[in-house]
């Protein structure tokens, strides 16, 4: 019996009706070859700075991809068997992990993960066999042979993927050595920027907060154990990040609550939090005040402020204690935006601030986020991420926001991934869905084809360039 083949239709995700398909093909062709701009993601800078060969298919395609890991876990796989939380994996361990993926291939049917994996297997590695227990080792060997070649080093992939700009995610106290080395290397022509991620420094109720303040004090040279010193330290580190090419900060709190406390009240709560005397309610107020002050800083220093709220992080407590964060056990929660952001937008909504609001609560797009972005100059709509970046939910997003906010108020494509080889697949999917949506408008007589082509280009290039100040 012959092995079933993997297929990758040239017209995947494009509309089936003939006139819409013709328009979508032309629109997609106009953006297919454009460089990738990736303003928010989680690829380690060390991969690119050190330019070391990827050691094996598992550590490249499986272990860092929490999209893949979470579904395998749901179907009975121990994350440790996928390399999660392990410092070393033997060759047999890596093969076993890859066999597990192939054994569970059917569990990915209909998911975005399968779509991206197929694109990677065919488009990057030339694999045309559908993964199965029988061919797992053969596919593993093909990928292993491919990644051992010089043209598969990370910097070479940056060129072959045509990634013009990519952002990493970094702690405010990071020295950004990898970014500095890349910037100083005249042979490296791509752009890799850090992203300022201060979440845990703004959460006085979180464990270890005072230890973080001590570290921040050490790195910045400011006494971060007082409100004024903390503010100075944050401004110092933001400036350091900008000097190393940063264009944005990223924030992920449970809610979007904002407030501007008077200085004495904020300082008093800050002091009480450092001393361990603040109430839960006071610490929540302080966190919202500190978060709002990041918007004030952004309006002054030019870093675009992105927010990824409404996630119950580390929902599986036992898995968190065993493996740590960012393993895929997060769960969406509901969110309220209009009232929560009102203090911030009332102060900074029509200033030079650029605020990109993401959500994984789809109900918010047409009810709250799109109407806000249709008024406030500072607010942009973040494209779907995490649980809602599959083709179906992306199209729902486009229909929900375009009718009231148009195309000029969206962030442009954000892949938000740790899976390096999935970046081309994710951006290609986005361009195909742009083409499908725009073709609908052309067929309905709401756009001319030349306008649709221009908008598609804008969504890929001009929009992220403008929103992130590239």
Curated annotation (Swiss-Prot):
Query: Which Pfam families did the record assign?
Result: UxaC (PF02614)
EC number(s) per UniProt? 5.3.1.12
What is the top-level taxon of the source organism?
A: Bacteria
For the biological process aspect of GO, one term held by this record is: D-glucuronate catabolic process
GO molecular function term, any single one: glucuronate isomerase activity
Give the reaction(s) catalysed.
Answer: D-glucuronate = D-fructuronate; aldehydo-D-galacturonate = keto-D-tagaturonate
| This protein's pathway | Carbohydrate metabolism; pentose and glucuronate interconversion
The top EC class is: isomerase
InterPro entries (UniProt xref): Metal_Hydrolase, Uronate_isomerase
* Keywords attached to this entry: Isomerase
Q: Which HAMAP family match?
A: UxaC
Fetch the PANTHER family from UniProt.
URONATE ISOMERASE
* Family according to the record: Belongs to the metallo-dependent hydrolases superfamily. Uronate isomerase family.
**Protein's name according to its UniProt entry:** Uronate isomerase
């Amino acid at each position: 019996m012959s092995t079933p083949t993997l297929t990758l239709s040239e017209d995947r995700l494009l509309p089936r009706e003939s006139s819409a398909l013709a328009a979508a093909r032309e629109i997609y062709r106009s953006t297919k070859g454009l460089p990738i701009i990736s303003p928010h993601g989680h690829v380690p800078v060390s991969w690119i700075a050190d330019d070391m060969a990827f050691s094996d298919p598992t550590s490249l395609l499986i272990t860092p991809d929490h999209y893949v890991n979470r579904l395998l876990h749901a179907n009975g796989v121990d994350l440790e068997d996928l390399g999660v939380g392990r410092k070393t994996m033997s060759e047999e361990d890596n093969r076993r992990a890859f066999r597990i993926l192939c054994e569970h291939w059917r569990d990915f049917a209909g998911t975005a993960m399968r779509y991206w994996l197929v694109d990677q297997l065919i488009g990057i590695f030339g694999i045309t066999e559908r993964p199965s227990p029988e061919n797992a080792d053969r596919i593993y060997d093909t990928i292993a042979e491919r990644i051992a070649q010089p043209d598969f080093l990370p910097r070479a992939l940056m060129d072959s993927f045509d990634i013009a700009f990519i952002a990493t995610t970094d702690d405010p106290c990071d020295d950004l050595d990898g970014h500095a080395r890349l910037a100083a290397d005249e042979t490296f022509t791509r752009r890799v920027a850090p992203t300022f991620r201060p979440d845990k420094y703004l959460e006085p109720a979180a464990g270890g907060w005072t230890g973080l303040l001590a570290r921040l004090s050490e790195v910045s040279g400011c006494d971060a154990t007082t409100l004024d010193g903390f503010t100075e330290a944050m401004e110092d580190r933001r400036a350091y990040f900008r000097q190393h090419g940063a264009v944005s900060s990223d924030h992920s709190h449970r809610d979007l609550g904002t407030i501007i406390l008077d200085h004495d009240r904020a300082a008093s709560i800050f002091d009480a939090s450092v001393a361990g005397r603040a109430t839960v309610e006071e610490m929540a107020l302080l966190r919202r005040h500190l978060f709002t002050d990041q918007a004030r800083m952004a309006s002054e220093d030019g870093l675009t402020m992105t927010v990824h709220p409404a996630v119950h992080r580390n929902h599986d407590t036992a898995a968190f204690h065993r493996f740590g964060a960012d393993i895929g056990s997060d769960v969406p929660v509901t969110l309220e935006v209009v009232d929560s952001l009102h203090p911030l937008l009332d102060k900074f909504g029509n200033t030079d601030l650029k605020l990109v609001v993401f959500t994984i609560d789809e109900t918010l797009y047409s009810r709250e986020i799109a109407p806000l972005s249709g008024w406030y100059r500072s607010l942009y709509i973040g494209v779907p991420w995490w649980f809602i970046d599959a083709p179906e939910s992306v199209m729902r997003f486009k229909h929900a926001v375009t009718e009231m906010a148009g195309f000029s108020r969206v962030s442009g494509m954000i892949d938000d991934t740790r899976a390096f080889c999935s970046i081309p697949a994710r951006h290609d999917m986005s361009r195909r869905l742009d083409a499908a949506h725009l073709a609908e408008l052309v067929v309905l007589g709401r756009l001319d084809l030349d306008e649709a082509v221009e908008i598609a280009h804008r969504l890929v290039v001009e929009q992220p360039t403008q929103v992130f100040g590239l």
